[in-house]
Amino acid sequence: MSDLNSTGNEARTDLEIFSWGYDERLSWLGAAWECADNGHYYELPVNQEDLIGLLRAGVHHSSALHCKLNVLTSTFEPTALLSRAEFKKLAFNFLVTGNGYLSAERNRFGKVLGFKNRLSVYMRRSSKKYEKDGYFYLRSHVIATADFIPKSDVIHLMQPDLVQEVYGIPDYLAGLSSAELNRSATTFRRRYYDNGSHAGFIVYATDNNINNDDWNNLKDQFKKAQREGNFRNVFLRSPDGKSDGIKLIPISEVAAKDDFLNIKNVSAQDMLTIHRVPPSLMGVVPTAAGGLGDARTAAEVFAANEIEPIQAAFLEANDAFGAEVFRFKPYTLATVGK
């Protein structure tokens, strides 16, 4: 039996089988070492930077959180220990990251004068291996520059988790895939539009009458056909060429019938569902003839089912601290006079 490589005819592989891979674990879910003890503090179970990034990219996701924040802030009554401005910062951190932190400010005699919000992204719970019980406020990723705050000076509000009780996690994690999908659909459409309303193509040329200089000029023109060059015309002259000497083979067609609108609508509905905020309170434009229903009724139900439980979570801190830090008034809608 002769060897194929010894005949001078190189063996060619014309068939290649590949796959797109398996589902990858999204970074915002954390890793197998959730709340790992590094000797100083416990690591966070959820990537905080990813949560903030999605807040700035997801339209409905951001709108729902800000709607809750505005209603909560409107019902808060400033106390001797907490101002409205500090409460708004605290509530925003609590809604987005699942954690809210207040640190006490004391006078020289140790009396608490008030509370200031601490950004939850930089707060870490000290581990049992550390000699003191409290929290680290990380100014950077270097532990040497962190501020240590005793536990007695911190009010930690957190949304509950099923696997750990060190940190809270936001209750909307199940909807982050939809927020990612919504953002990806918008990003793809924007890049598709900037690219000249095409997703790329292959230039297949068999015309030998075009020299290398002309080919280089043609390539330069194709490279410039983006953004402001979308409507640029390309003139190519080949007197003895064939009609099919140059072909444009689209890599993928993205026509008006693509699923962009369906993806946007379905993912938006998912985000509204996970946040349980009525669309009429978020500025959503109705598409059905019946509209979005009575906004006043929706606001009253929303306040009873969503806002009051959050208020109750804040009020529990009053009992834990032994003083009135939080105070709320009932949520009411203004009546427009005739």
Task: For each feature predicted by the language model, list its residue ranges.
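Extended, charged amphipathic alpha-helical segments
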Residues: 3-8, 139-278, 282-292, 301-338
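Structured surface patches comprising rigid loops and adjacent beta-strands/short helices at the edges
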Residues: 112-128, 147-160
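Short, well-ordered strand-loop elements centered on a beta-strand within folded domains, enriched
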Residues: 109-118, 128-140, 244-250
